[in-house]
């Protein structure tokens, strides 16, 4: 009798463990929001608050936020930050409100542009809701061109943002507590699955205080678009409704991609954001190239970065973005751009060539596999690795580091401006971990062309 009970108990325990293991290894959904649950409905309290640089980040910035539709043309209040809780009499800026209807209901997205600020000054600001206000946030305007600058660069976040992007953002903030600017290389969300607003809610939740502590400059990815008239002769890419209202970006882009291209100056750096999806799928590559030529040609600063979602040199098998190389690459080489920051391919790879330095990185959970070509032409490369990048500019030296989700150094180099000799790349190998490769034959969904999803 006792033996029978013992066998039954052991079998029951094994069954329970097996059930737990089976549950633990199921593919994780893109969001943590269960079906039928409304997690990110708009309210009278301001949320999704994000600051972005003005064209001249020394004298201004812009803020976007969301409320329910009871709030229209709310205020942003701003003062020079001080140590007293008495904020004094603030300057008030009236926002422009735009209606957006989603699976979470109707919302008003607001934009306030703040100009006329003093360089290298810490400002406190807050945004208005329905009979309430946000917390006071701090933003320091850009300093003189000779001042040091630390910034962050993230590859695609896209999937499972709260679950797995959160830890990378936290690690990045720990490693770069003095960062003032954050660049995102597109595909911030996945989209196209009927819960776009949930995904944007998760993106903001995953980024926690970063969007109100730094100024944020994103590039649009293909997942910020959707397919209209899919599987018909009229099929075309259309920019998703969230993008134009979620961020308050400079309005200086090319006419053919006005909402998705822009440039700005931050100290001794000019950043130009191009739209790879529009260039490749909507035929704007030539127009973007002419605009890029002007934006880079008028750059008075020592440093320049071009950011785009799709890579010029793809590290993933089966991808080849010919139109980017045909129209835009000659402009980048003509103006001796220092860095080209990219995403899209869900691996890490740095092209083995003199400047411009072409980098592809990934922050989120989706992980692809490297092509044989990438293994030959790029170094270092990585699969199955979540990363963030820290860039530090000080005088004639740009210091670049790529770190893993746990903070380990993966890639590092310096670009040194030697005046008449141009910019020289200096490898920094000390402290780097070994290259990482995917050891799984397939994903939990059975896809052999990916490492994780």
List the model feature ranges, each with a label.
Residues 4-14:
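Bacterial N-terminal signal peptides
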Residues 19-153, 174-177, 384, 390-453:
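Acidic, histidine-bearing metal-coordination/catalytic regions of metal-dependent phosphoesterases
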Residues 82-109, 152-167, 190-192, 234-237, ...:
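Acidic/histidine-rich helix-loop elements
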Residues 111-113, 122-138, 198-300, 319, ...:
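Extended active-site neighborhood of metal-dependent phosphoesterases/phosphodiesterases
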Residues 129, 154-159, 186-188, 222-223, ...:
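Active-site metal-binding loops of divalent metal-dependent hydrolases
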Residues 148-158, 268-278, 305-309, 356-363, ...:
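Active-site-proximal beta-strand elements of phosphoester/diester hydrolases
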Residues 149-219, 224-225:
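Conserved, compact domain cores that house catalytic/ligand-binding motifs in diverse enzymes
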Residues 185, 189, 299-316:
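Short acidic, glycine-rich surface-loop motifs adjacent to enzyme active sites
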């Amino acid at each position: 009798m006792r033996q029978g009970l013992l066998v039954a108990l052991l079998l029951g325990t094994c069954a329970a463990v097996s059930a737990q293991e089976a549950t633990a290894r199921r593919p994780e959904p893109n969001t943590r929001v269960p079906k039928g649950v409304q997690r990110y409905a708009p309210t009278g309290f301001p949320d999704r608050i994000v600051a972005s640089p003005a064209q001249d980040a020394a004298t201004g910035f812009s803020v976007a936020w969301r409320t329910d539709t009871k709030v229209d043309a709310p205020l942003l209040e701003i003062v020079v930050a001080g140590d007293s809780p008495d904020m004094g009499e603030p300057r008030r800026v009236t926002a422009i409100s735009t209606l957006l209807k989603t699976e979470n209901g109707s919302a008003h997205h607001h934009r306030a542009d703040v100009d006329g600020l003093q360089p290298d000054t810490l400002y406190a600001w807050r945004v208005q809701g329905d009979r309430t206000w946000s917390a006071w946030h701090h933003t320091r305007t850009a300093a003189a061109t000779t001042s040091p600058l630390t910034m962050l660069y993230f590859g695609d976040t896209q999937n499972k943002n709260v679950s797995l992007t959160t830890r990378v953002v936290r690690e990045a903030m720990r490693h770069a507590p003095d960062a003032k600017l954050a660049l995102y290389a597109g595909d911030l969300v996945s989209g196209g699955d009927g819960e776009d607003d949930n995904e944007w809610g998760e993106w903001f939740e995953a980024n926690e205080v970063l969007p109100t502590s730094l100024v944020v400059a994103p590039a649009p990815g293909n997942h910020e678009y959707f397919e209209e008239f899919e599987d018909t002769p009229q099929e075309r890419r259309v920019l998703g409704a969230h993008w134009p209202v979620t961020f308050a970006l400079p309005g200086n882009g090319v006419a053919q991609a006005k909402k998705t291209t822009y440039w700005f100056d931050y100290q001794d750096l000019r950043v130009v954001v191009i739209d790879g999806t529009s260039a490749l799928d909507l035929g704007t590559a030539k127009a973007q190239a002419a605009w890029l030529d002007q934006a880079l040609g008028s750059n008075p600063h020592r440093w320049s970065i071009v950011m785009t979602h799709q890579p010029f040199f793809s590290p993933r098998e089966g991808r080849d973005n010919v139109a980017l190389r045909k129209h835009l690459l000659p402009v980048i080489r003509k103006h001796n751009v220092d860095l080209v920051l990219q995403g899209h391919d869900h691996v890490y790879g740095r092209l083995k060539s003199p400047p411009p330095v072409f980098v592809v990185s990934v922050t989120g959970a989706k992980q692809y596999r490297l092509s044989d070509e990438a293994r030959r032409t790029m170094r270092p490369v990585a699969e199955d690795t979540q990363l963030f990048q820290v860039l530090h500019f000080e005088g004639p030296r740009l210091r670049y580091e790529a770190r893993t989700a746990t903070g380990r150094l993966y890639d590092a180099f310096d670009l040194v401006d030697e005046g008449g000799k141009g910019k020289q790349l200096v490898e920094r190998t000390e402290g780097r971990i070994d290259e990482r490769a995917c050891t799984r034959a397939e994903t939990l969904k059975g896809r052999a062309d990916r490492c994780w999803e």
